[in-house]
């Protein structure tokens, strides 16, 4: 089915208000969920909203909590999210990293005791729109087996890198071949994954999203490489924030909350003049996209460039929402 941005935001806002979230916070949170969905990231927008409400009702998310600065070391700051709303706090933390970068050339905010930030790409994009390189990542509850294991002991720990090119170039990727949100999107659409995304119960690689969702044997991105990246990202976020690791979140908490996150902004214009920056970025993009195609019908894409097109299409034609997901939201 198709809905407008306004309908989507109003539905989110209604549910948040009914759960006792104050009107200003509810409006800002509903706006972020709707913007994420409008950008085409359904897995961490509309599809994720019922799960967000469940955690709100369980007390994992404290809607009136505000992040608190713990330590300041010039370009580096350490904050405690105090289990506040994840996407609103993440936006504030990237804003703070940008402020630090304006003063120091680079800004790093390490956040502990946080909640799921929903679409991580929002915060990298936020920095790139202002002319900064944006880098951020988060740890999570253990939802992926380390390479060679059958049991989940590491997080998908998504990493975002956004570059202020025209259009913005951005990688937003979990350390698994697919996020669990994208497994859900493909399952709801009745599609197999385009490439192997995990193992079945017999230990064979599979493209069946429902099987992987059930047995949790999701495949690390690049096999052992994604497994290794997940581990070191967790270590850095844990140390810099003095927060909880994947092991602590998984073993000590009843659900995924109290996680650790990193937000970095770099002011490019302190290092290179604008015309030179733009020319260098354009040359990189042209060099990549003019490579001989393996399939003449398949364009060579640059990461993140599709979001401008998706956003325009959704604004023009309406936002596609799975019927079953919309029914869940209406029933909340």
From Swiss-Prot:
Give its E.C. classification number: 1.1.1.130
Q: Which GO terms describe its molecular function?
A: 3-dehydro-L-gulonate 2-dehydrogenase activity; NAD+ binding
The record's subcellular locations are:
Cytoplasm
Q: Name one Pfam family in it.
A: Ldh_2
* Ligand binding (NAD(+)): 168-174, 224-225, 304-306
Q: Which Gene3D superfamilies match?
A: 1.10.1530.10, Hypothetical oxidoreductase yiak, domain 2, Hypothetical oxidoreductase yiak, domain 3
What reaction gets catalysed by this protein?
3-dehydro-L-gulonate + NAD(+) = 2,3-dioxo-L-gulonate + NADH + H(+); 3-dehydro-L-gulonate + NADP(+) = 2,3-dioxo-L-gulonate + NADPH + H(+)
Active site feature: 44 (proton donor)
UniProt-listed InterPro entries: Diketo_gul_Rdtase (IPR023689), Mal/L-sulf/L-lact_DH-like_ah (IPR043144), Mal/L-sulf/L-lact_DH-like_NADP (IPR043143), Mal/L-sulfo/L-lacto_DH-like_sf (IPR036111), Malate/L-lactate_DH-like (IPR003767)
- Top-rank taxon of the source lineage equals Bacteria
Keyword annotations: Cytoplasm, NAD, Oxidoreductase
Transmembrane stretches in the record are none
Secretion signal: which residues?
none
A Gene Ontology term for the protein's cellular component: cytoplasm
User: Which family would the database say this protein is a member of?
Assistant: Belongs to the LDH2/MDH2 oxidoreductase family. DlgD subfamily.
Which PANTHER family does the protein's record reference?
2,3-DIKETO-L-GULONATE REDUCTASE (PTHR11091:SF3), OXIDOREDUCTASE-RELATED (PTHR11091)
Quaternary form? Homodimer.
Function summary: Catalyzes the reduction of 2,3-diketo-L-gulonate in the presence of NADH, to form 3-keto-L-gulonate.
The protein in question is named 2,3-diketo-L-gulonate reductase
**Organismal lineage:** Bacteria, Pseudomonadati, Pseudomonadota, Gammaproteobacteria, Enterobacterales
């Amino acid at each position: 089915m198709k809905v407008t941005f306004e309908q989507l935001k109003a539905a989110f806002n209604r549910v948040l208000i009914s759960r006792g979230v104050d009107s200003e916070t509810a409006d800002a949170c509903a706006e972020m969920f709707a913007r994420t969905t409008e950008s085409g990231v359904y897995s961490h927008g509309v599809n994720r909203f019922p799960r967000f409400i469940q955690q709100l009702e369980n007390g994992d998310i404290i809607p009136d909590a505000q992040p608190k600065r713990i330590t300041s070391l010039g370009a580096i700051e350490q904050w405690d999210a105090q289990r506040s709303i994840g996407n609103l706090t993440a936006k504030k933390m990237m804003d703070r990293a940008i402020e630090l970068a304006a003063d120091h050339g680079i800004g790093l905010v390490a956040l502990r005791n946080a909640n799921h930030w929903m679409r991580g790409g929002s915060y990298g994009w936020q920095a790139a729109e202002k002319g900064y390189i944006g880098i951020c990542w988060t740890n999570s509850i253990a939802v992926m087996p380390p390479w060679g294991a059958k049991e989940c002991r590491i997080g998908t720990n998504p990493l975002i890198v956004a570059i202020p090119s025209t259009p913005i170039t951005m990688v937003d990727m979990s350390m698994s071949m697919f996020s669990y949100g994208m497994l859900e999107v493909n399952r709801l659409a009745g599609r197999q994954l385009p490439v192997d995304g995990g193992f079945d119960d017999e230990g064979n690689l599979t493209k069946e999203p429902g099987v992987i969702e059930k047995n949790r044997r999701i495949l690390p991105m690049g096999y052992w490489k994604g497994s290794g990246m997940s581990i070191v990202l967790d270590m850095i976020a844990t140390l810099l924030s003095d927060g909880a690791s994947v092991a602590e979140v998984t073993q000590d908490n009843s659900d995924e909350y109290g996680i650790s996150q990193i937000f970095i902004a770099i002011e490019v214009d302190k290092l290179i003049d604008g015309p030179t920056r733009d020319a260098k970025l354009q040359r990189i993009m042209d060099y990549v996209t003019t490579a001989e195609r393996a399939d003449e019908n398949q364009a060579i894409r640059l990461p993140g460039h599709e979001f401008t097109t998706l956003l325009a299409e959704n604004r023009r034609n309406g936002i596609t929402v799975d019927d079953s997901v919309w029914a869940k939201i209406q029933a909340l």
